[in-house]
């Protein structure tokens, strides 16, 4: 048998070799797998570095762009390009940005950036509103280690939203706590706390509401706890679905007292249920910062200026094209009206027309003052021509000694200071042309007359003075009854009126019984106090108020009645043209003053019949209708050349009497000792209380309690009114701070004399439907558009119907249309159609003498308010608040039983610096109206916004993506 054992030799070696081969192969496989994974991991790591480098670069670019638009509203392409320069490119370890890898793409239109108007998309705080949209594409390519690259793009919008797209906005705390139902409409936003309460009726928030701080339901801003004694605890409805309140009750829900974002007032514990309430229950229709609300800022606010810079006069040296300068209405205006105590105050103001000097209103003793005022440092004179009763001269005081007519100063002008009026040219924006002479030559007084009739065409745009109020003739007196007459045994009632260039005065009734038949009655009356009397009318009747026949007599002061039947039928005048005078005598005119009890009375206490100096406000009155004519060129010559930018803007800054004691103008009242919460009657306490610090800087200012006037004081004043300081006067009693609010004057003194404190204001009149500029739009010309904005550094009063009318309400009429309108001032007060300066002065603390009538206003309003403070021991439950949204529009009349109809947008950017009188109701300052308030939905269209509407800015991200590069 053959054996094969030797044939098996070497098999083991083969097996070993095969195993070795397999193991080697496996090891090679493991090696390649391991090294491959390492390479993949390294590549992934490098790509991750590049990826996060690209993301970081994109976030840096987005942040820089957002920060840029915080302080720039109209950037140039070069400014955008600069944001991609080397100083902006981030420095990241292991990452570089190749050339062309850090860019912002945009579309140009001419020399600027292309923008569109439209609805804002995305999820930012301005989403859903109409705005100016400027699109950008942000692109970042980041190179990482080992030639890795990642490219990221983001599409964003820079959006600018006009503030009047909001129904109500406040930069500080915002309070709702009306008694009757209140449903204004439009979006609601505040950069502070949102206090929501209602006292009897229902408050409806029928659009989105946001508070950057907290939503507070538990108390008012003065700390009053809602629900105490059953007050301020009724329904606050907030919508839960678009189109909800009040259209669908099911789509809104009452926000309970316990459902604020905090459990109490500001700074209290967070409500643990708030996020669910805000985001889920109310579907985001009410938010605070915790649930997505953002702060809304004007560009100038985050550029370092306070929002009140909008209305402040530009300081010397400021660039009009800077962020702050371009936001000021001083620079935006078509027409600006500036008044100061000295010519030096105008020197070097930005953009000023230095070729013309300011016009003097207070040159005591100027040659020929009755017809002209000399300019102090130029070769010529300004003439207020034509000189006549329809175009009177500058008011001059006849003096206390001249006729004992309640005048303080002798032989000095009553207006004071200098005025400069300039027009910005439409052909070359930024260039200003002096038009002072042209404007003043149209007239400076209102309600003047020629002969016995009002002037047919009084074209005055500015009313700086008015005819001296016509006194009421005194009552008959010194009655004597004698026999041998023709009068029967009866009682006769008599009224005597004075005749003269003013027409016919009012009279005062008196009566006398004959005491028997066949009698005659002799009586006297006081001589009328004005010069120019041509005679008297004597009215007689047999019942009080029934004087129905009269006789006319000459310039005498006695009469004997011995006639059974008087020859002429007629009734006693019940009203007189109290501000009419047919005269060219400067002493027959007085300043335009009113009394504001909110400013003058520190507490809501009735009784005093005298005025306080703080409440007498001197007005620059603007006849809106005549201004419309001037812009259209139907009066004057220059108006059509004025800057037209979606309409016209008029700016006013009156700083006469504004002096901080170091000859500096501040634009602020400067008296911060008027609230004194711990003092029941409000007497100054000599310290700065928190709500008095309107600047928020902790500095106690009292210079506003002292008058600074520029005459030499060598004139005769009523005893004790002024001290003898040669350059500044201190009202006796104001020298001691504890007497500042007790110094008083009579109604006639307040009406006829210049203000002695810095109390200047603007009043708009004759602004009914169809009277606002531009003329073509207001008269309903087909295709015409444009609006009208008035901005002032001072408080503004609107008298009578404005951009609407009693006859038509908020509707337009044939040939009379509303225009987009805004009124922007330190504070805004609405005066009714029935308002009268004389009644106002005569009834400083008596509402019965200041009765309002139903009036209509259609305009956006921006104004200041006052700081809230803890509820004091005096006053009402809401004392210490700012009055709430329902009292943001100020009143100084008895509106009881009347309706105040308002349509517009309510905006508060700042704390008032001049109208510092606190909210108080309802004994002295006003009685509330029935409020017909609502948001003007026209403002939801950018084309229907007033010129110069301030805007919020934001950068809104729309999309984000990563591009796949070939190198990846």
Give the location of each predicted region.
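A short, surface-exposed beta-strand/turn
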Residues: 151-161
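C-terminal globular interaction/adhesion domains in large, modular proteins
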Residues: 70-135, 144, 162-165, 169-469, ...
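Short, exposed coil/turn segments at beta-strand boundaries within extracellular/luminal domains
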Residues: 144-151, 502-508
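Membrane-proximal N-terminal amphipathic helix
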Residues: 39-71, 190
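Aliphatic-rich helix starts adjacent to a transmembrane/signal segment
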Residues: 2-7, 14-53
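Disordered, low-complexity "stalk" and linker segments at domain junctions of extracellular
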Residues: 470-580
């Amino acid at each position: 048998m053959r054996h094969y054992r030797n044939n098996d030799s070497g098999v083991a070696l083969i097996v070993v070799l095969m195993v070795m081969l397999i193991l080697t192969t496996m090891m090679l496989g493991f090696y390649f797998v391991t090294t491959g994974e390492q390479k993949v991991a390294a590549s992934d790591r490098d790509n991750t570095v590049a990826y996060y480098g690209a993301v970081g670069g994109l976030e840096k670019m987005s942040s820089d762009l957002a920060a840029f638009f915080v302080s720039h509203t109209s950037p140039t392409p070069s400014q955008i390009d600069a944001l991609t320069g080397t100083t902006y490119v981030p420095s990241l370890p292991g990452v570089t940005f190749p050339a062309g890898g850090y860019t912002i793409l945009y579309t140009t239109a001419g020399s600027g950036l292309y923008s569109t108007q439209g609805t804002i998309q995305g999820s930012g705080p301005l989403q859903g509103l109409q705005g100016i949209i400027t699109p950008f594409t942000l692109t970042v390519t980041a190179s990482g280690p080992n030639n890795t690259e990642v490219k990221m793009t983001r599409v964003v919008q820079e959006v600018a939203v006009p503030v009047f797209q909001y129904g109500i906005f406040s930069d500080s705390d915002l309070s709702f706590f009306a008694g009757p139902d209140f449903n204004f409409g439009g979006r609601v936003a505040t950069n502070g706390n949102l206090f929501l309460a209602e006292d009897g009726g229902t408050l409806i928030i029928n659009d989105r509401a946001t508070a950057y701080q907290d939503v507070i339901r538990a108390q008012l801003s003065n700390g009053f706890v809602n629900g105490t004694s059953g007050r301020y605890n009724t329904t606050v409805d907030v919508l839960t679905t678009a189109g909800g309140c009040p259209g669908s009750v099911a789509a809104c829900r009452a926000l309970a007292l316990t459902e604020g974002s905090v459990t109490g007032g500001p700074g209290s514990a967070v409500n643990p249920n708030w996020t669910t309430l805000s985001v889920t229950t109310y579907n985001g229709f009410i938010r605070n910062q915790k649930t997505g609300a953002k702060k809304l800022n004007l560009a100038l606010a985050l550029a370092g200026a306070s929002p009140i810079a909008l209305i402040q006069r530009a300081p010397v040296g400021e660039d009009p094209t800077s962020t702050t300068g371009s936001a000021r209405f001083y620079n935006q205006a078509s027409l600006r009206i500036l008044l100061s105590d000295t010519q030096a105050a105008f020197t070097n103001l930005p953009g000023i027309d230095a070729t013309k000097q300011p016009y003097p209103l207070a040159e005591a003793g100027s040659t020929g003052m009755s017809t002209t005022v000399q300019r102090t440092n130029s070769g010529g004179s300004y003439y207020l021509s034509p000189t006549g009763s329809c175009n009177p001269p500058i008011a001059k005081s006849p003096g206390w000694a001249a006729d004992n007519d309640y005048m303080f100063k002798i032989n000095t002008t009553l207006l004071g200071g200098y005025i400069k009026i300039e027009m910005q040219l439409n052909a070359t924006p930024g260039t200003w042309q002096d038009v002072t002479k042209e404007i003043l030559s149209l007239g400076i007084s209102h309600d003047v007359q020629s002969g016995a009739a009002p002037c047919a065409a009084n074209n005055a745009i500015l009313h700086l003075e008015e005819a001296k109020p016509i006194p009421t003739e005194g009552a008959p007196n010194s009655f004597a009854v004698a026999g041998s007459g023709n009068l029967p045994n009866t009682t006769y009632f008599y009224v005597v009126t004075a005749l003269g260039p003013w027409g016919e005065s009012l009279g005062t009734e008196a009566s006398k019984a004959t005491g028997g038949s066949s009698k005659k009655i002799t009586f006297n009356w006081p001589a009328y106090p004005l010069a120019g009397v041509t005679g008297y009318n004597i009215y007689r009747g047999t019942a009080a108020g029934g004087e129905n026949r009269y006789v006319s007599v000459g310039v005498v002061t006695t009469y004997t009645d011995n006639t059974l039947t008087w020859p002429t039928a007629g009734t006693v005048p019940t009203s007189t043209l109290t501000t009419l005078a047919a005269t060219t005598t400067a002493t027959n005119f007085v300043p335009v003053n009113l009394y504001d009890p909110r400013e003058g009375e520190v507490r809501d206490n009735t009784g005093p019949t005298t005025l306080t100096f703080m409440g007498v406000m001197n007005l620059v009155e603007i006849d809106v209708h005549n201004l419309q004519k001037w812009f259209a060129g139907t009066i004057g010559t220059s108006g059509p050349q004025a800057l037209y930018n979606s309409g016209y803007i008029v700016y006013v800054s009156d700083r006469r009497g504004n002096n901080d004691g170091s000859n500096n103008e501040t634009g602020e009242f400067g008296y911060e000792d008027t609230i004194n919460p711990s003092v029941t009657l409000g007497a100054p306490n000599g310290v700065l209380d928190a709500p008095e610090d309107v600047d928020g800087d902790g500095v106690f200012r009292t210079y506003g309690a002292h008058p600074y006037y520029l005459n030499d004081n060598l004139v005769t004043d009523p005893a004790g009114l002024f001290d003898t300081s040669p350059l500044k006067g201190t009202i006796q009693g104001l020298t001691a701070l504890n007497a500042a609010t007790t110094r008083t004057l009579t109604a006639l003194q307040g009406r006829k004399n210049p203000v002695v404190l810095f109390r200047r204001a603007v009043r708009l009149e004759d602004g009914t439907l169809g009277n606002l500029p531009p003329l073509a739009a207001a008269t309903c010309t087909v295709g015409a558009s444009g609006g009208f904005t008035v901005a002032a550094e001072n408080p503004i009063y609107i008298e009578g119907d404005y951009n609407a009318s009693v006859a038509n309400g908020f509707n337009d009429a044939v040939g009379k249309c509303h225009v987009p309108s805004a009124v922007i001032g330190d504070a805004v007060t609405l005066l009714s159609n029935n308002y009268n300066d004389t009644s106002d002065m005569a009834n400083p603390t008596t509402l019965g003498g200041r009765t309002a009538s139903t009036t209509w206003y259609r305009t956006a309003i921006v104004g200041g308010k006052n700081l809230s403070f803890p509820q004091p021991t005096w006053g009402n439950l809401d004392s210490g608040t700012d009055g709430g949204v329902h009292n943001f529009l100020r009143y100084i009349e008895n509106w009881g039983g009347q309706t105040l109809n308002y349509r517009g947008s309510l905006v508060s950017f700042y704390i008032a610096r001049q109208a510092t009188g606190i909210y108080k109701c309802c004994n002295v300052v006003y009685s509330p109206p029935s409020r017909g308030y609502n948001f003007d939905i026209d403002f939801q269209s950018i084309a229907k916004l007033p010129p110069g509407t301030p805007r919020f800015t934001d950068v809104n991200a729309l999309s984000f993506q990563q591009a796949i590069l070939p190198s990846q």
